Amino acid sequence: MKLPKSLKYLLLAPILMASLSSCGNNDSNLQVAVLGDAVVALPTITNIDYEKGLKKNKEMFGKFGCSGIGKVLDNGDMVVGRSFDLYYSNNPAYLIRTEVKDCYKTIGLSYNTFDGKTFKEIKEKGVSQDELLTLLFFTVDVMNEKGLYIEANMRDEQPESTGIKASTGTNPGAELSMSFPALVRYLGEKCADVNEAVEMAKTINVYGMITDEFAWGGGYFMADASGHYGVLELVDNKLIWSDNYNSQCNFYVNSEYKDKATIGSGLGRYYLLNSEIDSVESEEDMATLMKKVRYSQILDPRTCIFDPTSEVCGYGDAYNDFGGALTLEMCRSGKYKDEIIAMMDASKAKERQKTLQQLKDDGKEWESVWQTVANCNNKTLRVTFFEDDKLTFNFSF
């Protein structure tokens, strides 16, 4: 196949890509393209998740659904599970490889929509230079050749209710400034382990993604081949490190700001991950666990641990019904699991029915994007696109 002009240009750059071809099941709604080692996963605009086929709850629109958790297996391997979950999944997803002089090699996942929202559009137009260069600065999962893995999750913030300032810069005057997502690949190329990544991040002026209504902070879950892991969070113009913290969703976990978790989202996902992580003994187990926190599950009242509406404001109804006494530690320990489930089964029946109706009637869709299982010791990324569980890609150096 003839290479697009823009792709020929990039063969000269430190991004390893080759000719365009397609793979996957033609009967599925998921369209997949491969640019050499780069994967383009393109769900059609009308696609909904296979497993549940649920429409999105309109109250959820604009929320984030990403989750990540790590564990050192009995064989010593550091394994991280990650779901990249947004309220849309029509964006093309790319796997990017970089090999830059005096930097570590990386493999990472990115997405964008400049050149189209379907494989057909991109095949017809080619992949533009603008698209590919933008992807480099929105690589939200990265593994490098030393076994350092970093994944980025957004935080939901409402400054008017929390007093959290928009993160316009953590280190004004620093030689280097970059946005929250751009830091992921940069640290992967420059750092060999978690300690180096945390220290280097603090020398950079990192700023958040800001709109008129929200000041989005974020968190990076980092892990390396030594088994060291933790969460670095961007909040209030600060970078705060929580050492040996094993998971993140879309609320703050550091001790200084965790009381602001009620305006984030993901407590139900967080609870499920931590209540089952001890049973994870392999990469396959981790992949199975991550499937349980996809939004097609969380938004189905028959399968979620917390009422779906609780995801709108983090603790939501579960938090309020416990008189504000439900904490991250309680969810982590599973201490009140039976009480929470009983409460949801009984007192939340009407809310569940209302949510089911919204799921059926709302024209918008919630579509998961991808799931990653990273092995820091083998330096591998296993990527599954939620729209087709049987379509899995394994990447290594």
What are these regions (language model features)?
Residues 27-126, 134-136, 141-142, 153-189, ...:
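C-terminal, well-structured catalytic/ligand-binding subdomain of enzymes
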Residues 194, 198-231:
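Aromatic- and glycine-enriched pocket-lining scaffold segments that form the walls
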Residues 1-10:
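Bacterial N-terminal signal peptides that target proteins for export
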Residues 11-15:
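Outer/extracellular conduits and scaffolds centered on Gram-negative outer-membrane beta-barrels
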Residues 19-22:
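C-terminal motif of bacterial Sec signal peptides marking the signal peptidase cleavage site
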